[in-house]
Amino acid sequence: MAEYDHYEDDGFLNSFNDSSQEEHQDFLQFRKVFLPCMYLVVFVCGLVGNSLVLVISIFYHKLQSLTDVFLVNLPLADLVFVCTLPFWTYAGIHEWIFGQVMCKTLLGVYTINFYTSMLILTCITVDRFIVVVKATKAYNQQAKRMTWGKVICLLIWVISLLVSLPQIIYGNVFNLDKLICGYHDEEISTVVLATQMTLGFFLPLLAMIVCYSVIIKTLLHAGGFQKHRSLKIIFLVMAVFLLTQTPFNLVKLIRSTRWEYYAMTSFHYTIIVTEAIAYLRACLNPVLYAFVSLKFRKNFWKLVKDIGCLPYLGVSHQWKSSEDNSKTFSASHNVEATSMFQL
């Protein structure tokens, strides 16, 4: 993203970087190829996956639980997030040509939707904890929880806007050999950066560790058809979050405390690679939080059938069989599926 672009430009970086000119040119060439390619992959996969989740959630799936409310807001945030990537892709290959207003706007949109996504993931984690550990209470208060869920989602968007204000205020277009959209980190206090990292990484991580630990303990003491599948999904969710988000946030933490690392070309490689890996969450969220659901996959095949693609895919018979199996499964495992599916 443009947050780091001006630190990787020739004129700015060479003013304090003691690495050789050749190394720096190699880095710039790598960055010019690597970031646009990664942005394009995330954009295409994120656009398709999150659009599917939104369409199915709105037109094929009734909002029957608090998780359903979150699963409408999560793909919306990720979808808007990935839609900013083509602008950063073009700017990475060429330069920023979209003006100062668009620079501030896209920095704001990018950041708002990033933190909205992470906070919603936190809420989904807590909701899963309540549904599994406090199943009876959660079921009895379903209507009340739905109302609170909508209020919580609204608050999340507002909080994300407030946390993103520094990027919007300090975002600007700089002329450093070429036009760059970004901001000077010196103008953003350590307190603000710490707040952003807390909401964007440490809070979701803490929620996952605490809630999933209790959920795992509960599942291990319970029997049932889906116990092992639910445990696998939990470990997968945790592993994906840690592998994609930890490296980039660790780099951001180092960046905020040890500025001398900017003198190392290798540190800049680390920044752009870990950043690209962190963005993969926008592609993986639809799989981890939607397509693992049997009901969601069933609605997906309904969508495919409605748009007339089913005969061309040659899966009409399989879809019919899957639908019958879904009905059988729902009839025999209704209570269990209600609580476990959301894992």
From Swiss-Prot:
Return the GO cellular component terms, semicolon-separated.
Answer: external side of plasma membrane
Record keyword Disulfide bond present? yes
UniProt keyword annotations, A-Z: Cell membrane, Disulfide bond, G-protein coupled receptor, Glycoprotein, Membrane, Receptor, Transducer, Transmembrane, Transmembrane helix
Query: Topological domains (Cytoplasmic): residue ranges?
Result: 61-69, 127-144, 217-232, 295-343
> Record's InterPro entries?
CCR1-9-like (IPR050119), Chemokine_CXCR6 (IPR002235), Chemokine_rcpt (IPR000355), GPCR_Rhodpsn (IPR000276), GPCR_Rhodpsn_7TM (IPR017452)
- Which SUPFAM superfamilies does this entry report, sorted A to Z? Family A G protein-coupled receptor-like
Give yes or no: UniProt keyword Glycoprotein.
yes
* GO MF annotation terms: C-C chemokine binding; C-C chemokine receptor activity; C-X-C chemokine receptor activity; coreceptor activity
Q: Which cysteines are joined by disulfide bonds?
A: C103-C181
Its membrane topology is listed as: Multi-pass membrane protein
Give the top-rank taxon of the lineage listed in the UniProt record for this protein.
Answer: Eukaryota
Instruction: Enumerate the Extracellular topological stretches.
Output: 1-33, 91-104, 166-188, 261-276
Q: Give GO terms for biological process.
A: calcium-mediated signaling; cell chemotaxis; immune response; inflammatory response; positive regulation of cytosolic calcium ion concentration
List where the protein spans the membrane: 34-60, 70-90, 105-126, 145-165, 189-216, 233-260, 277-294
Report the locations given in the UniProt record: Cell membrane
Q: Which PROSITE patterns match?
A: G_PROTEIN_RECEP_F1_1 (PS00237), G_PROTEIN_RECEP_F1_2 (PS50262)
Please give the residues the UniProt entry marks as glycosylated.
N17
UniProt-listed PANTHER family: C-X-C CHEMOKINE RECEPTOR TYPE 6 (PTHR10489:SF705), CELL ADHESION MOLECULE (PTHR10489)
Role this protein plays: Receptor for the C-X-C chemokine CXCL16. Used as a coreceptor by SIVs and by strains of HIV-2 and m-tropic HIV-1.
Family to which the UniProt record says this protein belongs:
Belongs to the G-protein coupled receptor 1 family.
Q: What is this protein called?
A: C-X-C chemokine receptor type 6
Look up and give the organism this protein is from: Macaca fascicularis
